[in-house]
Design a protein with these regions (language model features):
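Extracytosolic ligand-binding ectodomains
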Residues: 1-307
Length: 307
């Protein structure tokens, strides 16, 4: 990642970097962006440090920190009288940070204990861990998985019969983009994320109609984050009438931007991470349907950021 980013900046003389999906890759990009003072917008990677210890005036994010979607689920579970939880996640940055966010929210809201189980990334052989969960008998399980690994876990958890006795919860990435793959095994699953089906705002309806017309599929959270990256860049360019040499003014405008997003309006924190609503969703049919707002206007704590 550093080598390719360096080529884009030094050889191709790009004005703006936009990327990426994976937190590990974004680490390499951040290094070059900071060294060269190149404007950078992160449309997905949730690495806490990107708008924490590694924050910089020229670094912006339009998605989330790994802490952010998981923290409110802690209070949701504690408020339901759940006291002892087993957490399970891939043993890598995103998994560790998501579990830390959930644990912080859970204990703060009155939860008693979170016992952490881990599996190497991207391993998806869950049988031994499911057996261990059954023997521990917690009040609930909280997990962080995404993509194909998430789909397999949801199906394996249901097949093991655990959902009948031990409720399963997760960060929204557990079910986003994989509802076709998990089918009946995902029905009723509750997750927290910064986007949901059934928001029913005028803005979201317009976005969904335009997206399905262009791509013949329903938009997910990744589509919204990418769209908002475009809105943020446009806000900066509008403020300087397209003159990208006016870097200081452009960055200031992006920091003050109010993004009229399909997920709901949001603003930038001082560390340049979205201050946004986090929704509690439930899988109903082929939707991650809105249940309620789990946390209104949640800002990441931006630990270590000196901006």
């Amino acid at each position: 990642a550093p080598e390719n980013t360096n080529k884009l900046v030094q050889r191709d003389k790009v004005d703006v970097l936009v990327g990426t999906v994976h937190s590990g890759v974004v680490m390499g990009m951040l290094k070059i962006a900071k060294e060269t003072n190149t404007l950078m917008i992160i449309p997905n990677a949730g690495l806490d440090a990107a708008t924490g210890a590694l924050c910089a005036p020229n670094i912006f994010r339009t998605s989330f920190s790994n802490w952010q979607p998981s923290y409110p689920m802690g209070k949701v579970l504690a408020d339901r009288g759940i006291r002892n939880v087993v957490s399970l996640a891939w043993k890598y940055g995103a998994g560790e940070e998501a579990v830390a966010g959930f644990t912080e929210g859970f204990i703060k809201a009155g939860g008693k204990s979170v016992r952490g189980l881990w599996i190497p990334f991207p391993n998806a052989e869950f049988q031994a861990l499911l057996t261990e969960i059954a023997s521990i008998k917690p009040d609930a399980v909280f997990v962080f998985f995404a993509g194909a690994g998430a789909a397999k876990f949801v199906k394996d958890y249901a097949a093991a019969g655990l959902r009948k006795t031990i409720p399963l919860y997760g960060s929204g990435f557990l079910t986003d983009g994989i509802l076709d793959a998990i089918q009946d095994s995902g029905q009723g699953l509750e997750t927290t994320l910064h986007y949901a089906d059934g928001l029913n705002s005028k803005r979201d309806k317009e976005f969904r109609a335009a997206y399905t017309k262009a791509f013949t599929s329903e938009p997910d959270v990744y589509a919204v984050q990418g769209y908002d990256a475009g809105l943020l860049l446009a806000a900066g360019l509008d403020a300087v009438k397209g003159d990208i040499t006016k870097r200081k003014e452009m960055i200031a405008a992006m920091g003050k931007a109010k993004i009229d997003s399909p997920r709901g309006p949001w603003t930038m924190s001082k560390a340049h991470n979205p201050i946004q609503d986090i929704y509690l969703r439930k899988v109903v049919g082929k939707e991650n349907r809105l249940v309620s707002i789990a946390h209104k206007a949640l800002a990441d704590p931006a630990r270590g950021c000196k901006l």
